[in-house]
Amino acid sequence: EYLNSVREEVILYTGLNYNIDEIGSLKRDLTLYLDMEVLFDIYGYNGEVFQRLALDLFKLARDANSKEKRVRFRYFEETKAEIDLFFAKAEEIVKGKVLLKDNVAMKAITNGCQDVSDISDRKADFYTKLQYSYGIIQDERASYYYKSDTDANLEWTFSEEEKKDLEVQFAVKMISHINKLRNNKPFY
């Protein structure tokens, strides 16, 4: 899991670095959709190493945005729901209803919390910092299931085996949303 997370961070970092290595090389707007783990990395919930990598990504974006804002960061409604569930589990841990498992982010969130209101404060701080310090907001689109999105929908491509794996389903759903935003066309 740790190696996969590092790999994902490196892919994001390399992709941005390649596209904006030369100032002005980004000719069109680029919106990057971040998942829960990357958002936790930015905030520091997954430790200093991941936070440094995530902040390097923001430095690259800031450099690319020096002339005009081309790079934006967003997260999907489903990602927000995943984060909200994570914080709800943290509340259950603070209440003593669930045991704390070996999860770096969960430990960071629950550390020092005496009651549920402490978790609520941390959740509010998390979303506030994402928006006002980093400009990361939830995607504004109301739905990804309009009739006009049918051709770009990749969710129907699940194999029977993949339909059983919730993580694969979630990943394909997010990729499908991005494909719909791009109208089934590559970025480059």
Q: What kind of feature is each model-predicted range?
A:
Residues 1-187:
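Active-site-proximal, substrate-binding regions of enzyme catalytic domains
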